[in-house]
């Protein structure tokens, strides 16, 4: 899906706990027909730390970041990437479908500019979809977070707002998080549904 949407390269981090995952990615790397893949193998204490491992590969151009447990429709993602290419700031995927153990609520204004990220519902319509399209200057915010001992991607997102980076929300029809084995069947059913046409 990243190749189909114009990725120059695909940067992946996997942990050392499941060697079969690394083996699978290395198998993909040997196959033709996709953007070049860079692989980091490192076990980290949080998602922000994993991002930090990838950061040296991302700091020279706009990039899209997501996690392995985020499930979304391919056509939603394609529209999201097209919108990001047309803008100047960061574009964060959001959804009004809430089926997450600990959702991160996203505050927005009337123009979908992001005003904050909240652990509880403060009257927000959307939650984070776990897909982040950002400009290279976001790496400076990441480095500040690491220097301050922060962890978790939700705290990185808050820091982007603190630093005054321009962020907009991009609503997707539905985004699922696969946190447990029981979520796999739910994700498969979601992906097999016929998409509802967007207005």
Locate each region found by the language model:
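Conserved N-terminal catalytic core of the sugar/cofactor nucleotidyltransferase
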Residues: 1-65, 148
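A conserved hydrophobic position in a structured secondary element of the catalytic/binding core
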Residues: 16, 66, 133-134, 179
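The conserved acidic donor/metal-binding loop of glycosyltransferases
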Residues: 67-71
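A short acidic, often aromatic-flanked loop/helix-cap motif at beta-alpha or helix-coil junctions
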Residues: 44-49, 99-101, 175-178
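Conserved core of the sugar-phosphate nucleotidyltransferase
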Residues: 73-147
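Catalytic-core segments of class I nucleotidyltransferases/pyrophosphorylases
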Residues: 113-176, 182-198
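Short, hinge-like loop/turn segments at secondary-structure boundaries
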Residues: 27-31, 56-58, 81-84, 107-112, ...
């Amino acid at each position: 899906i990243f190749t189909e949407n114009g990725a120059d390269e695909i940067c992946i981090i996997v942990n050392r706990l499941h060697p079969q995952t690394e083996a699978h990615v290395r198998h993909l790397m040997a196959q033709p027909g996709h953007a070049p893949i860079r692989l980091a193998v490192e076990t980290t204490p949080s998602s922000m730390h994993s991002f930090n491992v990838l950061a040296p590969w991302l700091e020279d151009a706009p990039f899209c970041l997501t996690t392995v447990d985020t499930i979304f429709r391919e056509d939603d993602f394609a529209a999201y990437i097209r919108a990001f290419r047309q803008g100047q700031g960061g574009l964060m995927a959001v959804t009004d479908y809430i089926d997450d153990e600990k959702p991160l609520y996203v505050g927005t204004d009337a123009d979908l500019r992001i005003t904050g990220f909240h652990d509880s519902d403060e009257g927000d319509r959307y939650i984070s979809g776990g897909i982040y399209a950002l400009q290279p200057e976001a790496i400076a915010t990441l480095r500040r977070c690491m220097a301050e001992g922060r962890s978790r991607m939700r705290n990185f997102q808050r820091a982007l707002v603190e630093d005054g980076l321009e962020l907009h929300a991009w609503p997707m029809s539905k985004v699922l998080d696969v946190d447990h084995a029981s979520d796999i069947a739910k994700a498969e059913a979601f992906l097999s549904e016929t998409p509802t046409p967007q207005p």
